[in-house]
C-alpha cells in the first residue's frame, strides 16, 4: 500500500564495541531525531511523512509510528505514500546511534573517540580536535573481510589555503 515499510536487518550486526545492533536501535534513533530537545535540523525532511511525526516533534516521541516486532525487523508507517522514502531512509540523520552511549554521555557522546560507538566499516580510534581524526578497521563490521584499509586519517584544517597547499 506504500504506507508500511519493513526493513530486515542482516544477521550478525554489531556496534564497534562488539554489542549487538538491533531493530530497537533504529526505533530509538529515529524517535531521537524527532525529539525537540535534540532539534535535529533535517527531522521534518526525512521523517515528516511518518505517521505521528507532528506529535513526536511536540514531545510525544512514542507517537512516531516506528516499531521493532523483533530484533531484526524495523517497521515504519507513513501518513501517505512517499515513493522516495527508501532514499530518505538512507540519509545520515537516520543512522542508528547506540542508546546506552548517548544516554550515558549526553551531548558529548559524539565528541570523543571513547564515546563515539559506530557500526560502519571503521571506528574512531583517535580524535585530536583541530588536528586529526584517525579511524581503524572495525573488526565487528558485518563485512570486515572486504575492508582492505587498516586505518584512515582525516587531517583537520580550518584554513582553506593551508588545506589546498597540503593537498598539492
What is each model feature region?
Residues 3-39, 121-168:
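Extracytoplasmic/periplasmic ligand-capture domains
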Residues 8, 21-27, 34, 38-100:
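Surface-exposed binding/hinge segments that line
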Residues 61-63, 71-72, 78-151, 159-161:
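Gly/Pro-rich hinge or "lid" segments in bacterial periplasmic/extracellular proteins
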Amino acid at each position: 500500500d506504500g504506507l508500511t515499510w519493513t526493513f530486515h536487518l542482516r544477521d550478525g550486526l554489531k556496534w564497534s564495541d562488539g554489542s549487538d545492533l538491533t531493530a530497537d536501535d533504529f526505533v530509538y534513533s529515529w524517535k531521537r531525531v524527532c525529539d525537540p530537545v535534540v532539534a535535529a535540523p533535517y527531522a521534518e525532511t526525512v521523517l515528516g511523512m511518518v505517521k505521528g511525526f507532528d506529535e513526536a516533534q511536540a514531545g510525544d516521541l512514542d507517537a512516531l509510528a516506528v516499531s521493532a516486532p523483533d530484533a531484526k525487523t524495523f517497521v515504519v508507517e507513513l501518513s501517505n505514500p512517499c515513493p522516495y522514502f527508501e532514499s530518505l531512509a538512507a540519509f545520515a540523520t537516520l543512522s542508528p546511534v547506540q542508546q546506552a552511549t548517548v544516554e550515558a554521555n549526553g551531548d558529548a557522546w559524539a565528541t570523543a573517540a571513547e564515546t563515539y560507538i559506530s557500526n560502519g566499516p571503521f571506528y574512531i580510534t583517535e580524535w585530536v580536535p583541530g588536528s586529526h581524526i584517525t579511524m581503524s578497521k572495525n573488526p565487528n563490521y558485518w563485512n570486515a573481510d572486504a575492508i582492505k584499509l587498516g586505518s584512515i586519517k582525516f587531517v583537520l584544517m580550518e584554513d582553506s589555503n593551508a588545506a589546498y597547499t597540503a593537498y598539492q
